[in-house]
Amino acid sequence: PYFFVKHPPSSREKEVIQRLNGETSIVEKKDLFSDERKRLTKVELEDPSLLTVASRQLKERWEVHIPYLLSYVYDHNLVFGIPYGLNGETLKPQCKINPKINRIFLEKFVEIKEKDLKKFQMLEEWFLFCSQPIPKIPLDKLGIQANLEYEKIYLGFLLSRVANLPLPVALTNRHVSTWIKSILHFYLRRENILIPRASELRRDEKPRRIPGALTFPPKTGTYFNTVVVDFESLYPSVIDAYNLSYETVNCSHPECRENRVPETNNHVCTVRRGAYSILIGALKDLRIRWFKPLARDDSLSDEERRLADAASRLLKLILVSCYGVTVRIPGLSQPALAETITAYGRYALKQTWSLAERLGLRPLYGDTDSLFLDDPRDELVDLLIRTVKKDLRLDLAIDRVYSVCVLPRAMKAYFGIMKDGTPEVKGATAIKSSSPPFIKKVFMECVRELADVRNWAEFEAAKRSIRRVVDEAIKRLKAGKVPLEDLAYQVKLHEDSAERLVKDEPMHQPYQCAVQLMDSGIKVTRGSIVSFVKVKPFIYGGKKYTVKPLNLVKNVQEVNVEDYVRNLRTALSQVFKPMNISFDEEKKMTLADFI
């Protein structure tokens, strides 16, 4: 175990080192930000537990936080989870690869090898590691006391190899930030770069609010043949394409200051390739261009496709976190880097929207990394994709096609019917997890009426069918024919019910339910999920209550039917208002009129 201090150490640092019986030597390491070599005093200790003592007593120290086991593995260029052979006293990797598969890999990534050698080297290494067979070793020999299915063991080995973590950690640690830290630290140690302290990585900036993604308000209405294009792994792609890393954002080179980041005061280095950009870019390419296509390759067996899909999902988990960790995780956060990532994300969507309009396409809605296009010509979509690749260096692809797409006024809420009739619903009130099954079922029945719609005539017929579905549902409700369990809301409690009870204020419905459950002898705590039915108002404990726990409702006569009718119409209106569906032909009222 060891750590570094400045060279030469101060008299106080020397005293601390002597008390710890540390041995010192002079080493040279590269500074991540200046790329200059600096002399440091390396302090080696006999006992790893003394690292904690050193971290408390020495203010200016580096790499004291790196776990001893990982530090040893990094220094000896070892990788967890891959096969080794013992050659004398030296461990040698025993990685083998099928020549045919290796040739396919090299052909697929030849362009990256020519243009970005450092990224290719990481890509090739991870490809080699991930291609190794999973050894048939009893898990208890590896310190794992559990029976796991093969896919979990496979993913554990993959994560162990990619993030260079011990297999037990890879199988149990769900903190993606830990994985990313290990990936970054191993790379920096191999490049002989001093791993910065958390404050240095932040550039001594304090955490601040980072502007988020861009959303274009939807053009409300119903559309046929809506094509949705999206950026494949937008933030990882931005990090890769624009060389975004801790040391490249706001670098010290005067010649780089003209390379401004849109809508910010930041600039990006044009002299050096960034470490974070290399690593995230390589992981992104490995997922998108290798494992993702393998998961869809019909020439492979079902098992091979399933494992490729699992690998793709694992890498995606790392990639979707690559922005978030730069915002809030100590040792990975840097406000300027996080701000630059989202700025380029907004820039990409804004430029693509403008380009689509210039090409004569009709963009309807844009959110973060997706663009909805109204009945576009195939050749124009292809031109948009090619131009985005050329101008923005980002990959745009067709994600899905809706035969019918309904865009309400609310952002991040829409539904569409796929070409095969499958409904896809996003953000609609009716399908929130807490909504009762009755409302969810009615909503999905309405959506299914649109499954075969391809033109306006079929759409008008479907609207009439939807009206009948809702009318029939309301009739069943009023006749008491809806089972009580279908009327139950399920809500998680975020506060202690006993504390809410002593507050002199109206009690929200979930806590009304919780109080009644506790009074009946059922234990309810913060985090509990309660199930309740809206009933006709009654007095309970001197307060007006409007719900009862599902198990305490005696019959359907207690149900507040009008409340459910109102909630049903409110939930459906979010989606159906743009469709102008009326429920009363004589009055020509729309769903919105009932709210």
Give residue spans per PLM region:
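DNA-dependent DNA polymerase catalytic subunits
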Residues: L139, L159-C251, R257, S299-L307, ...
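Short, basic/polar, glycine-containing "phosphate-handling" surface segments that engage DNA
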Residues: Q132-K141
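Active-site cores of enzymes that catalyze phosphoryl transfer or operate on phosphate-rich substrates
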Residues: P99-K113, G274-G331
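A short acidic, often aromatic-flanked loop/helix-cap motif at beta-alpha or helix-coil junctions
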Residues: I134, Q145, Y402-V406
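Helix N-cap/beta->alpha junction signal
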Residues: E46-S49, C130, R377
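Residues immediately flanking
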Residues: L106-K108, S131-Q132, V229-F231, D375
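DnaQ-like (DEDDh/DEDDy) 3′-5′ exonuclease domain used for proofreading
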Residues: P1-E125, A146-G212, T220-G221, I239-S245, ...
